[in-house]
Amino acid sequence: MKVKGSLKSHRNRDKNCKVVKRGGKVYIINKVKPRCKARQGS
């Protein structure tokens, strides 16, 4: 999983990318391409 400062460009990488909030953190998940996963953090 990649840790990015901003997920804006990351969520447009694939049409199956979804933005989810879990436990106060923002994640990008993709069930079709799991290698597109990312978490927002500084």
Curated annotation (Swiss-Prot):
Q: Name one GO cellular component term.
A: ribonucleoprotein complex
Pfam families, per database record = Ribosomal_L36 (PF00444)
Q: Name one GO molecular function term.
A: structural constituent of ribosome
Question: What GO biological process term is on the record, naming one?
Answer: translation
UniProt KW Acetylation keyword: no
The residue range of the signal peptide is: none
Enumerate the UniProt keywords alphabetically. Ribonucleoprotein, Ribosomal protein
Q: Does the keyword field hold Ribosomal protein?
A: yes
- Annotated family: Belongs to the bacterial ribosomal protein bL36 family.
List the PANTHER family.
50S RIBOSOMAL PROTEIN L36 2, LARGE RIBOSOMAL SUBUNIT PROTEIN BL36B
Protein name, UniProt field: Large ribosomal subunit protein bL36
Q: Which gene encodes it?
A: rpmJ
